[in-house]
Amino acid sequence: MASMFKSLVGGIHNCNLSLLRTVLPMRLQTTIGNEINLHGVGLHRGEYASVTLKPAAPGTGIRFVRVRDGQHDAYVRASYDCVTDTMLCTTLDNHAPNGARAQVRTVEHLMAAIHVCGIDNLDVVLPQEEVPIMDGSATLFVEAIHRAGTVHLNAVARQWVVKQLIEIKDGARYAALQPHPYFALDFTIVYDNPVIGTQSVQVDEFDNLEELVMPARTFGLMRDVEMMRTH
């Protein structure tokens, strides 16, 4: 799954992309207005977990800060080329040598919230590897970011336009990005379990993501729990 994800997102970088301000209106980069502190449980370890979101300067991007012994020990970029695993959660790795290496896990709901809220620059401070799972969805992250507010920075944000079809297949799984005049999402899951079964969602406006997608919760099977807590 990690290779499929990296192939799809990497394809965005490798295809003919342009920064088209004639198509996408120029906008300023953003960060949050106030520091955010959240805590809960890590999904995989079942242990207490906390996260602090801090405003960041233009050009920082989304950066995870791993804290060990009270020190900011290592940085992990939220970038497709840092994805090392997508089995049951998304894992990012900074690929640094020796003691500077760090990983962060279960970042997907937080990253979705950051994107939906339009935040470009953020330091995400973690004293443990896992982001707290909160209520199993992205909603509590979205609400916290809204409360903190958005600050516009004195730098122009990069906005990319997909210029050609990108398709990735992995067995029965399929994902594609294709040129379109506006944001649209069409997603279907077919799961061999009567509780989940087949479910679909279609979103034709970016602003509808918060209502239609952010409340979607992680689900799991009991047979996976022990494996999750030992990996």
Model-predicted segments: where are they?
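C-terminal regulatory domains involved in ligand/effector binding and gene-expression control
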Residues: A2-D120, V125-H231
